[in-house]
Design a protein with these regions (language model features):
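Intrinsically disordered, low-complexity basic tails/linkers immediately adjacent to helix-turn-helix/homeobox/MYB/SANT
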Residues: 271-285
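Long, low-complexity, intrinsically disordered segments
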Residues: 284-299
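An amphipathic, hydrophobic-aromatic interaction surface with interspersed Lys/Arg
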Residues: 1-273, 298-299
């Protein structure tokens, strides 16, 4: 094993799988998908999870909660455990810092269950969807039994699923809707206040996918500024920058800032010293162009 890897607990499998790190290249791709509102973001994330897992894993068998746990762990290890939320409503600003490590523990502890609806000669088993984006009640169905015919809905194409569910009478579908809300216990991430709306993670809604977008979104302009500084000022190869993690990138940037601050203080100190010989003293406040450092950037 050449690269650093780490274990991630997957609730539905009740086991841990080993993953490699998220690099800048992948993170930028995620951010672009998010900001372009691209419908293929969910597909990209699932494919990325499969690529990053060293152990054998069938991502098609993972629930939305499993995928959230994996992505939260990746985010915590490779980007950081803190997420700062800010809003500005009616000129009233609010900010809140979330501990994603704590949220991962709470999500891991969410209890899920399956239930079977039995009406006449029809048995329908519903479970937490194995997808990030929930399109309809069909995503909750894992198995349908009509008389002696049994259909494994997880193995069917979307069109075949619709053909089977079209056979279900209205009273079965109505019963399913009433049972779906009982499959999971939602957790509150943010309690609603005047300028920050309530945020809840519920495995029976699309809140999981929306939360994933929130924790991975970032400022693309900052990324390119970081790339410029690391390549032009610290002389790092672009392929190397592509393949380090966002948190490693921030360490490099902070180190560069520290060096420039030391250089700036040295220049200011020299500017206050008396001139020696024929060497003119720098004018007060003089600084090199390299001492001007973009600040305030955060992932």
């Amino acid at each position: 094993m050449d690269n650093f890897s780490y274990l991630v607990y997957i609730p539905s499998l009740n086991t841990k799988k080993r993953f490699i790190q998220l690099n800048n290249n992948k993170h930028i791709s995620i951010v672009k998908f998010i900001q372009n509102k691209d419908v293929y973001l969910a597909e990209y994330l699932v494919s990325m999870i499969e690529d990053m897992c060293i152990d054998n894993i069938n991502v098609k068998n993972l629930t939305g909660l499993d995928l959230l746990c994996i992505l939260l762990a990746i985010r915590n290890i490779c980007i950081g455990t803190r997420l700062e939320l800010t809003t500005d409503v009616n000129n009233e600003k609010s900010s809140l810092t979330l501990d994603l490590g704590d949220i991962l523990k709470r999500v891991t502890d969410i209890k899920t269950k399956s239930t079977t609806i039995k009406i006449d000669n029809i048995h329908v088993t519903i479970e937490i969807p194995r997808t990030l984006v929930i399109e309809s009640y069909i995503d909750f169905i894992s198995k349908i039994k009509i008389n002696k015919s049994v259909y494994d809905m997880r193995s069917l194409s979307k069109s075949d699923k619709h053909k089977i569910t079209d056979l279900l009478p209205g009273k079965v579908v109505t019963s399913m809707y009433s049972k779906i809300g009982d499959l999971s216990s939602p957790i509150t991430i943010v309690k609603g206040i005047s300028t920050l709306p309530e945020m809840v993670i519920d495995a029976t809604t699309s809140s999981i996918f929306e939360f994933i977008k929130l924790i991975f979104d970032s400022n693309l302009s900052n990324f390119y500024t970081y790339y410029y500084l690391l390549a032009s000022k610290m002389h790092l190869d672009l392929s190397y920058i592509d393949n380090i993690t966002p948190i490693e990138t921030e360490i490099y940037i902070n180190k560069y800032k520290e060096e420039m601050e030391i250089a700036q203080k040295s220049i200011e100190s020299e500017s206050k010293s008396p001139a020696v010989g024929n060497i003119p003293a720098p004018s007060p406040g003089a600084q090199s162009s390299e001492s001007i450092i973009p600040g305030g950037f955060k992932f």
